[in-house]
Each structure stands twice: as C-alpha cells, then as structure tokens.
Amino acid sequence: MARKTPIERYRNIGISAHIDAGKTTTTERILFYTGVNHKLGETHDGSATMDWMEQEQERGITITSAATTAFWRGMAGNYPEYRINIIDTPGHVDFTIEVERSMRVLDGACMVYCAVGGVQPQSETVWRQANKYGVPRLAFVNKMDRTGANFFKVYDQLKTRLRANPVPIVIPIGAEDSFTGVVDLVKMKAIIWDEASQGTKFEYGDIPAELEGTANEWREKLVEAAAESSEELMNKYLETGSLDEDDINVALRQRTIAGEIQPMLCGTAFKNKGVQRMLDAVIDYLPSPADIPPVDGQDDDGNPIKRSADDAEKFSALAFKLMSDPFVGQLTFVRVYSGVLKSGDTVYNPIKGKKERIGRLLQMHANNREEIKEVLAGDIAAVVGLKDVTTGETLCDIDSHILLERMEFPEPVISQAVEPKSKADQEKMGLALSRLAQEDPSFRVRSDEESGQTIISGMGELHLEILVDRMRREFGVEANVGKPQVAYRETIRKNCDEVEGKFVKQSGGRGQYGHVVLKLEPLPPGGGYEFVDAIKGGVVPREYIPAVDKGIQETLPAGILAGYPVVDVKATLFFGSYHDVDSNENAFKMAASMAFKEGMRRASPVLLEPMMAVEVETPEDYAGTVMGDLSSRRGMVQGMDDIVGGGKTIKAEVPLAEMFGYATNLRSLTQGRATYTMEFKHYAEAPKNVADEVIAARGK
C-alpha cells in the first residue's frame, strides 16, 4: 500500500513539562486544532482526552504517555498534510521513567514552561533526559495570560539553568490580562487570534508601535542565529544585512535538528492562543524520521548494524510501552524504525529468542482507536495480542535479526508490603501485579522469603499509591498496604585479598567436593557486580567456573548485615581445587557462596541508603524553617536560589528514610505554600547509628 503521507512529513514529538505548566491542556489544543477533537477538553474538569486513566482525570496529572496521531496543514492552511504522532509524557517526578521511555522513541520534543514558574525542577530532569537521547526540541512558554507572566524571564532561565540556546521565533504582545497575541519574528507581523472561533481563525497585522524596537532587536538575534548555520548564509547576511523567510527557516531547522538551538514560542493554551503557531514550528523545525541518524543495533553475533527509516529495509521496531485496555486487552505500543509491519506477520523478539504473531494493529487517538492494516517505517502504533513482550524489547524481521539498544530503567528506591484482603483477592493479586510489572519496568514485585509477604517496589510514594489504586480499579483487587520501606543496599569498603570456601561431603558413595579461593574488592558506586576468572593451570576445571560465578550471584540478593542486596563488588576467583569423582557444579556453587559471605564479613561491610535530590520552592518567610527541617532529617542543604517574583528554591540531598510523610509535614510548616520535588540521586554509606538501627530491626 502506498504511503498516504511521505516520511518527510511525519513528526514524532513529545510534549514534556513540569507538573503544572499546562502540558495536557497544550496537547488538548493541538488535538483540537488538528481537527481530531471537536470539543475542547480541560484538565480541571476531568474531560481531557489524553489523560485517559480514571485516576489521571481525578488527580489532574498525566501518568501514562498515550500516543496519538493527528494531522496538520499549517495554521493558515498553507502546508501539505503533515502527520504528527504525539506522545504525552507525565510531569510528576515519580514518573520520570515514563518520560525517559518516551524520549527514546521520539524524534523531537516540545518543552512546555509556565510563564510564571519558569524552569522548575522537573524541567531540568526532562532536559537531561532529552540531552541523553539527543532529542531536538523547541520551547513553548505557556500561561502568558497569568499574573506574573514574563516571557523574557523564562528565556534567561533557559540559558542559565538549562544551559540551553533558545532562539525566540515569536515575542508576546502584552502579558497577563493584556496578552493578545504574538509578533512573528520570521514574518515580522503581528498574529492576533480570534477568541470567538476558539483560536481557529487569526489575522496578520502590523506590529504595535510600542513593540517595534523590541521586535527589531529580537529579529536581529533570530537572523544572526540563522546565519550561523553556514558560511554561505553568514556571507549573504553580512553583504545584505538580512535573510529571507525561506533562508531563515531552512537554517533554523538545520541548527535545531543538530541540537545547537531551541526555537522558542509562547502563548496560552487555555485561552487558545499561540499553540497554532507552535504546531507550525513543529513542522518547520523539528525532524522527520528521515532526518535523524539510522538506528543502531547488534546482529546475533554482537556486531554493530544500522537500520534506516525506509519501508524497503528489513523490519525493526521497539516496544516502548505496554498498557491494559478495558476493550481489547493488552496493547503494546511500538515505534517502527525500519521496514513495514502488517497484521498477521510473524516477527522475532531477540531478547526472549521467541517468535510473536502480530494480531490487530491500532492507531491510537488518546482513548479511541482506528484499526489499520500496516505500520510503516517512522510510525508509531499499538499492537494487540503480543504474548511475551516487555517494555524496551526489540521486534524484528524473522530472517534478519537486530537487537536495538535496550532502555535503561532505574532501580526502585521504595518498597511496601502488600497483602490481599480476602482469599478471592489473593488469586487475582498475583495476576494483577505481574501485569503491572510487565507494563512498568521501574515497578518490581518479589516475595519475601522470611515473612512470605509480597513486596512491591517503585520510584516513590505516589508511584506505588497509583499502582495499588490501579490494582483495585482495573483488576478488582482489594489490598492492604504496609508502611513504605527503604531499599537499602550492602557493599564492602576494603579488599579481602584471600578468602576460602570449601564444601565437602564425602561419606561413602558419590560425595560433594568444591573448593575455591576468592579475592573481593569494592567497585566504584554504580559498578554493580563483576566476576573475574584468574585461574591458572586448571586448578579449578573450566566447566565449574560458571558455577562459581552463579554461586556468588545467588548470594548477592541477601547480604550478611541485614539481608539487603549486595552491590559494587568485584570477585576474582584465583585458586581452588577439585576431586575427580566428587566435584560437581552444585559443590562449587556452595563453596563460592560460603567464600563470598565470609569475604564480605572480612571486607568492612557497610549499609548503603538511597539519597534523594530534594528541591523545595517556598515563600521567603519560611526558607529558614524549611532549611532547619531538612537539616534535622540528616539533609545536606546544597544551595538556595531566588525565585523571580519572590520566594526561594532550596536544594538539598536527603536520605530517603527521612522523607516519608514529608509532603504533609511541609504543608503544615509553610501553611501549604511550599512545594517540593524529589528524585533518586545515588546510594551513600549510612551513618553507623542508622545502620545499627536498620540491622537490629531486620534481626527481629
């Protein structure tokens, strides 16, 4: 089937922002102007289309990144039809995994900022993730109609806080109540939207006299930014003192895709102004799948290979999101990087080493769906009925294997015990938890061997609260949840140069004989676990060496101090012995486990606790109280910045163990006027008194 839309006219974009910058409203307006939605959805009355889980509509925050396809012909109807796939991303810090997951499959992003709040903590996290995946982006300053709105203040913050290189394409006409439209610096005309038509109609006019000086100054900066794209343009600019509209757009596009600049726009999504011009900027400056480099992967032998965004190439795709849908069951969202995927095809999953048959294919529009026959290179769609695919896995051509780079998912930092309320709930709970864990790789489920309890782990209190809530709503499971527990870790501080483990049972008949000598060394933070085989002269036969590694790995989940997982340790096997008849894999596994435990005891074992980066925005009157409170929680205050328009931002590093219930506490300290965000930073050694308490509590 021929393409309806050439690949050059595809845009895969994310709308990304801090929790209250108005991102969902912005996305809603995009859907409205692109003709998909005929009634505007508002987050605060719970009718927003993208926020399609019940809880999101109740809480007014976006949790899952729903993928939606929309079409756009330009605000003046002067473009051929473009196809825009929009991934809505959550703005709450507990859901950064969702942001990261969507960044991986996007080609470009619109970063939404509040004209009053500017660059907020989550904006910095999202910016870092976009840098990590090299995503070209543009900035949209929303809420220009709000009291305290200041476009140029946000411009300064983008430069200082994010080290961005924003290039305004428009500047606002007025602000707060008097915000009426924008000056388009490319066309050097004013754009005024018609309120009666909800912003679908607009007029170009002359630039207001009082803005001419400002407009000329910013136009000059815009043209200079364009001229810097090539020597040829720079010479043209120096000779003529100006550049025409086409030159400017081509040059800005080139520099945006290269990540050198970020076009910057503004408006108020709620009042239907400015989003239309932003959509034109998406088309003008953000890349199509054909503009980005081919995707990297490996063949079956681990050799690097690439696939281009071309229908004629062999099929490859990344499953980036799983969702349970009340009507069709399990949905797997895929981004097709190369080739074509048709319903009925059989594809290969190289991570599981299994074939999968593709059932129905759906193009999603927030919460309704259109069945399609095929998905072409560069497109995003949902597949129904995949049995064994987890988030972050590759699907590829059955005869031409490629393994795309896997996504990295952070380790959970908080755990809770969860118990079904009744026998009936017990059976359903297992299924519900495994389904949720499949959808969300930052959510883990395990069974505590000692207590027999089911332990769930995630990225924060809100994350777990929402998952327990989903269990109740979607799977009908009523459960009691225990107090949140911190995910401690154990490691060593010193080397243990030689430790022996011997597992011998020889009492007639077939015995057991395993003997190993290990050296243990601490690794730098984040080093995980490393095993080195340094056996000389076959004192431990080749076939038993994997068993030694496995024996140690099976010991890692439960350390010797308090039974927490062991991290950042390097184990070197350098000596041992064996018995011709009695040695076997199991004996070497046992010997390795014994040696490792003893080695840990001798190598100054310590308890590690998760440290959180906490950022509190508070009125100035309460800054001292907030800092004192953070210090009392063993926090290290790392700095304090002024918030433009009053107030302070306090940055601190605080152990997670001290942060439970902080939201309630902060509210009472500041009469509800402060807000905070918190994200995992790193693990650090717990002070002795804290470690002793934790170890004693685990020993009970």
UniProtKB/Swiss-Prot annotation:
One GO term describing the cellular component: cytoplasm
Highest taxon of source: Bacteria
Transmembrane feature ranges: none
Gene3D superfamilies noted in UniProt: 3.30.230.10, 3.30.70.240, Elongation Factor G (Translational Gtpase), domain 3, P-loop containing nucleotide triphosphate hydrolases, Translation factors
Molecular-function annotations in GO: GTP binding; GTPase activity; guanosine tetraphosphate binding; translation elongation factor activity
Protein name, UniProt field: Elongation factor G 1
Main subcellular location: cytoplasm
Pfam families, A to Z: EFG_C (PF00679), EFG_III (PF14492), EFG_IV (PF03764), GTP_EFTU (PF00009), GTP_EFTU_D2 (PF03144)
tr-type G domain sequence ranges: 8-290
Entry function: Catalyzes the GTP-dependent ribosomal translocation step during translation elongation. During this step, the ribosome changes from the pre-translocational (PRE) to the post-translocational (POST) state as the newly formed A-site-bound peptidyl-tRNA and P-site-bound deacylated tRNA move to the P and E sites, respectively. Catalyzes the coordinated movement of the two tRNA molecules, the mRNA and conformational changes in the ribosome.
Family statement drawn from the similarity comment of this UniProt entry: Belongs to the TRAFAC class translation factor GTPase superfamily. Classic translation factor GTPase family. EF-G/EF-2 subfamily.
Provenance organism: Bordetella parapertussis (strain 12822 / ATCC BAA-587 / NCTC 13253)
Location(s) in or outside the cell: Cytoplasm
Keywords from the named record: Cytoplasm, Elongation factor, GTP-binding, Nucleotide-binding, Protein biosynthesis
Record GO biological process: ribosome disassembly
